[in-house]
């Protein structure tokens, strides 16, 4: 039972790190990346649909995204959705594809993005710590019910703490990498 609690905690922590990585993909770091458009939803015949389900997105150059809609009639709606998103990008279309030129970031914008990276990082760490707390509470219940001994409880909480430390170290490494990418000129 205690091993199960630890396994569940590990899986939840892994998911928290994955969610954090996905959040960071949406932060524009001055170079093109299909993940930038992940959160853009298009009003497609009255249904909010993610843009990556309506078009193929490619990165032919470092600062250019090309969006090729499967349905050409949706181009105008896609343009509206991109303009409405807070990406700060201006689409240009030639009737069959939408091109997004990614301008170089200003120093001020870089600092804002670095702050945002730190905020996401802190949120992810809080999520991991909450998972640790929940796992430790579960283990304490098991000890209280007599399913594990006090020594086993200590051993298992140490294991949960090690998991927490590992995941927080992962988050720190990812954060450092993304901050470096954002601050790069």
Swiss-Prot record:
Major location category of this protein: cytoplasm
SUPFAM superfamilies: Ribosome recycling factor, RRF (SSF55194)
Keyword Protein biosynthesis applies: yes
Record has tRNA-binding as a keyword: no
Lineage: superkingdom: Bacteria
Annotated Gene Ontology cellular component terms: cytoplasm
Family annotation (Gene3D superfamilies): 3.30.1360.40, Ribosome-recycling factor (1.10.132.20)
A molecular-function term among this protein's GO annotations: ribosomal large subunit binding
InterPro entries noted in UniProt: Ribosome_recyc_fac (IPR002661), Ribosome_recyc_fac_dom (IPR023584), RRF_sf (IPR036191)
Keywords: Cytoplasm, Protein biosynthesis
GO biological process, one term: translational termination
Localization (cell): Cytoplasm
Homology family: Belongs to the RRF family.
HAMAP family, A to Z: RRF
Functional note: Responsible for the release of ribosomes from messenger RNA at the termination of protein biosynthesis. May increase the efficiency of translation by recycling ribosomes from one round of translation to another.
Record's protein name: Ribosome-recycling factor
Organism name: Geobacillus kaustophilus (strain HTA426)
